[in-house]
Amino acid sequence: MEKLLWCLLIMISFSRTFGHEDMFKKAFVFPKESDTSYVSLEAESKKPLNTFTVCLHFYTALSTVRSFSVFSYATKKNSNDILIFWNKDKQYTFGVGGAEVRFMVSEIPEAPTHICASWESATGIVEFWIDGKPKVRKSLHKGYTVGPDASIILGQEQDSYGGDFDAKQSLVGDIGDVNMWDFVLSPEQISTVYVGGTLSPNVLNWRALNYKAQGDVFIKPQLWS
């Protein structure tokens, strides 16, 4: 009997953390500062990227307190192959291949925030959207290729592939609606995603998410519509 219960517990744990789960209207909650709590995402496609778009929601009270990681995509050749990072001086850092550009914001909203970031290698053009509104386009790492077999982490910034976390860069708050495509979304498509559309994401799909949660991470209903 004990052996049967143990097997059932293993099966439940496995399906919860490694299966493709529909996360519709759900969010990952990181309730406290930590260097051990994070969510690892497994991409549907593990190929190199010459174009991509990442969109997500996050909600935190840290924005005026300290900097923190929003999205960390490390490869074996570069721990910051794709990085979205909030700086407490009212700037988002967007990085590709270790190179970075920054986007200033005029005010810090005390509300859930939706962001989309896209990049294409052929031109180096970066687009960064906050709550459905675009910032001025910038140029970054023209001709670069993002590496394959990524380690994708929510809640922490990777200083090495899959690790070397710093609690002072951790997210405290909620994150959800994390979707990623291997192409640049058009302005019309960004608007669709902002109001809740998904457009069949083919790298990370929030409606069929393959993830593993580690530490104090909880799944709760989203606090945004």
Swiss-Prot record:
<keyword id="KW-0732">Signal</keyword>
<feature type="binding site">
    <location>
        <position position="169"/>
    </location>
    <ligand>
        <name>Ca(2+) 2</name>
    </ligand>
</feature>
<feature type="domain" description="Pentraxin (PTX)">
    <location>
        <begin position="24"/>
        <end position="225"/>
    </location>
</feature>
<keyword id="KW-0106">Calcium</keyword>
<feature type="binding site">
    <location>
        <position position="159"/>
    </location>
    <ligand>
        <name>Ca(2+) 1</name>
    </ligand>
</feature>
<dbReference type="GO" id="GO:0005509">
    <property type="term" value="F:calcium ion binding"/>
</dbReference>
<dbReference type="GO" id="GO:0006953">
    <property type="term" value="P:acute-phase response"/>
</dbReference>
<dbReference type="GO" id="GO:0010628">
    <property type="term" value="P:positive regulation of gene expression"/>
</dbReference>
<feature type="disulfide bond">
    <location>
        <begin position="55"/>
        <end position="116"/>
    </location>
</feature>
<comment type="function">
    <text>Displays several functions associated with host defense: it promotes agglutination, bacterial capsular swelling, phagocytosis and complement fixation through its calcium-dependent binding to phosphorylcholine. Can interact with DNA and histones and may scavenge nuclear material released from damaged circulating cells.</text>
</comment>
<feature type="signal peptide">
    <location>
        <begin position="1"/>
        <end position="19"/>
    </location>
</feature>
<dbReference type="GO" id="GO:0032945">
    <property type="term" value="P:negative regulation of mononuclear cell proliferation"/>
</dbReference>
<dbReference type="GO" id="GO:0001849">
    <property type="term" value="F:complement component C1q complex binding"/>
</dbReference>
<dbReference type="InterPro" id="IPR051005">
    <property type="entry name" value="Pentraxin_domain"/>
</dbReference>
<dbReference type="GO" id="GO:0042310">
    <property type="term" value="P:vasoconstriction"/>
</dbReference>
<comment type="similarity">
    <text>Belongs to the pentraxin family.</text>
</comment>
<feature type="binding site">
    <location>
        <position position="158"/>
    </location>
    <ligand>
        <name>Ca(2+) 1</name>
    </ligand>
</feature>
<keyword id="KW-1015">Disulfide bond</keyword>
<dbReference type="GO" id="GO:0010888">
    <property type="term" value="P:negative regulation of lipid storage"/>
</dbReference>
<feature type="binding site">
    <location>
        <position position="157"/>
    </location>
    <ligand>
        <name>Ca(2+) 2</name>
    </ligand>
</feature>
<keyword id="KW-0964">Secreted</keyword>
<dbReference type="GO" id="GO:0050750">
    <property type="term" value="F:low-density lipoprotein particle receptor binding"/>
</dbReference>
<dbReference type="GO" id="GO:0032930">
    <property type="term" value="P:positive regulation of superoxide anion generation"/>
</dbReference>
<dbReference type="InterPro" id="IPR013320">
    <property type="entry name" value="ConA-like_dom_sf"/>
</dbReference>
<dbReference type="GO" id="GO:0005615">
    <property type="term" value="C:extracellular space"/>
</dbReference>
<keyword id="KW-0479">Metal-binding</keyword>
<comment type="subunit">
    <text>Homopentamer. Pentraxin (or pentaxin) have a discoid arrangement of 5 non-covalently bound subunits. Interacts with FCN1; may regulate monocyte activation by FCN1.</text>
</comment>
<dbReference type="GO" id="GO:0030169">
    <property type="term" value="F:low-density lipoprotein particle binding"/>
</dbReference>
<keyword id="KW-0011">Acute phase</keyword>
<protein>
    <recommendedName>
        <fullName>C-reactive protein</fullName>
    </recommendedName>
</protein>
<dbReference type="GO" id="GO:0010745">
    <property type="term" value="P:negative regulation of macrophage derived foam cell differentiation"/>
</dbReference>
<dbReference type="InterPro" id="IPR001759">
    <property type="entry name" value="Pentraxin-related"/>
</dbReference>
<dbReference type="GO" id="GO:0032677">
    <property type="term" value="P:regulation of interleukin-8 production"/>
</dbReference>
<feature type="binding site">
    <location>
        <position position="80"/>
    </location>
    <ligand>
        <name>Ca(2+) 1</name>
    </ligand>
</feature>
<dbReference type="Pfam" id="PF00354">
    <property type="entry name" value="Pentaxin"/>
</dbReference>
<dbReference type="GO" id="GO:0042802">
    <property type="term" value="F:identical protein binding"/>
</dbReference>
<feature type="binding site">
    <location>
        <position position="159"/>
    </location>
    <ligand>
        <name>Ca(2+) 2</name>
    </ligand>
</feature>
<dbReference type="InterPro" id="IPR030476">
    <property type="entry name" value="Pentaxin_CS"/>
</dbReference>
<feature type="binding site">
    <location>
        <position position="157"/>
    </location>
    <ligand>
        <name>Ca(2+) 1</name>
    </ligand>
</feature>
